[in-house]
């Protein structure tokens, strides 16, 4: 990997939806909550004209009688254009009313718009019918669970107080709540059995906590309670505290992938002091609440005292906690807690709030207190204190500790040294989900569907995905031995693979060919292209340029850009991608209270692609760089694209990276906010929620929010189309299921509506072409 400059500015990926080591807490949160996320995925939810157009015509009369066509268009009222504008806003009913009056035999475009509106209504009715059916199904299941709880049959194995049964009922309540109307939801939550189950979950969580099983309390109880009632602050706060405690426990223990000593190696107390100095001069807010930072850090230290007596065995006589984690004796814990209480009082007594130096003084006092009481590893305590203090600022200001730097760099560049596979863990088995083309794994004969039983002799059964990744990747030219079991074969076998440089492509199509190449033309008759952008790396813009030129060479008429689940990447990449579709004006500006405008990115006319219709698909996981691209192209200044989907994540900020001068650590800190071309600032979710509002991020023009069932179906089909297998694999095998474009669109309401918007755009372009006297307007044969 080439040497990086000391300071870089970028829009990073959102650590909530991707695996990236932005902090010890984030990494452990991923490890701790992966099972919970998998469990909840199914229940909680919520993707101009061609440069070289082909000789395709709307109708014979349009091409042979251009004068008559122009006269007809000039006489036509603005009904078509107005109806199109209503459709772009998601106002299909209003558009339907508008086009009822004019004579569709005179204005054929109105007839095609009516067909599009009818298709939209069909999609909406089908979705509503599915929601109602799903709600009824959950009510039946809930009644069944209630009946099982009342049974007097001594042979009945159901125990309503058993955690598994509580989870099963909570999952039914969660799904019923998702599909219910507001009136149905109120009725559901007033049900005695539902109330009883929720109380049992709260009681069960308390029991788990008494036994030091904080993760169990979260996964089995509070994760479900939060899903059932996401607006309940008590559930959210208590769930967060449970996770904090669970993270502390795991962070102080050895794991199959690293020892505690390895985890905290290289961490110095000077790193915290350095970080505070950097933030005092460069953080996005002029006034930093150092008191709040101190309170959060001391709170974390208090949680340490709560966790250690239950989570660790008593410390042997004369042994220091520096060598291995253990529970301090009662006197040590009492002294630690008393010292923290005194420090807390000092913080509260400050009438004007703490200054920077006073926060550092609190840090020094906590370290001294630890030395006199707990004797916990200083590097571990520095990490705990620092992470908690920085969390008081925003979710994106974090320390990247020495152990995490390599993983962090990989997440930013999409480059690493490994073997080139995507892995998952269905049914607890570490499995190759897909291959990357022309990589060591592909060349060695590894295939999608292979179960990885062991890595270098270490069994993977109890290994987390993060741990498995760390064991499989490694320095270039080194070897890793994977013990695999292929579906349909009884015996395992070893495959030795030499690691190499892997560059993960950030563009995908809607499907693959038999040879593994991506297909980007999702609608051949209408020449509609589809490009899914999974991240914004230094190579994304050049990859996109190649794809667009190829599509335009095939007569591209319209483009769908899918930014769903794209959590971000490089700011420069987002600017370069946006610039491909804009001739002039501003793309984005970033502003800091210290330096004013840090970035002003104008569009350039050179190399701008044709002004064909565009739709951008967005969702709740579209963040950071994705929000910049979507916001710039849909901004009223440009009106280059229509946004379809649901509201984006709401990151709204730009981070900088600076390196600790005496070690490998890095500080990633929020340094600016970004503004759209119209100068509107993209609001962050955190600050917007504090104001009781919900207008964070970028809102869609046409809102289509997927249910959990729809999301699962869409992702299942997408994964099936994405899988790359070895050449020669039977394409009709049960383990390899490809789907047609029609099936892919039908399984994805956001994409389906996006296609309708695109076809509406094509009708509008057709009308404009006729008005301009073009004899070869945009094709609309299959609209």
Model regions: which residues?
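C-terminal "post-core" interaction segments
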Residues: 4, 8-13, 18, 28, ...
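Hydrophobic/aromatic side-chain positions at a characteristic register within alpha-helices
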Residues: 84-87, 146, 161, 209
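Short, charge-rich amphipathic alpha-helical segments embedded
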Residues: 99-123, 174-196, 225-243
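PDZ/PDZ-like domain segments forming the peptide/carboxylate-binding groove
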Residues: 144, 149, 203-207, 261, ...
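Cationic-aromatic interfacial patches
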Residues: 188-202, 207-346
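PDZ/PDZ-like peptide-tail recognition elements
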Residues: 379, 384-386, 393-434
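PDZ-domain C-terminal substructure recognizer with occasional recognition of PDZ-binding tails
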Residues: 428-431, 453, 467-512, 670-671
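PDZ domains, with a preference for the canonical peptide-binding region formed by the helix
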Residues: 446-484, 545-549, 573, 651-657
